Amino acid sequence: NHHEHEHEHEHEHEHEHEHEHSNEEQTCSEQNPIINRTHLSSVASTVGWICWNGLNFDAELVSKWLSNLSQLPGVIRTKAVLRTNEGWWSFNFVDRKEELRPNGYRRDSRIEVIIEGKDVPDVQSLEQELQTCLV
């Protein structure tokens, strides 16, 4: 019986995962402008945010922030597509290499930090830093 329960739980989890994408599109709004999506795994974890597209990031500040993040111990890379005061930009920081490119319009801004193992930085304080990058 215990085994069955586990199986059901796994199934539910997979089910949620499949539909995660459509759910998260609706939850980003003026009332709830920044949503955290953290996924922990022993191999590599991701800490990410989805930001309502009414938010405008300061391109220079957010670029510095992402660059600093990418150099934290354990961080493999940071990437983002953000609406900035200079239009939509995609950012990619890995091994001190930076790629910044103009990007087309998106429904929302997204940030993803990829980290080795489960030892992730404090998500709440990162989110506060992120908010200081808003215009």
Predicted regions and their residues:
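Flexible loop/N-cap segments at domain edges
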Residues: 113
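C-terminal accessory "lid"/substrate-recognition subdomains
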Residues: 1-109, 118-135
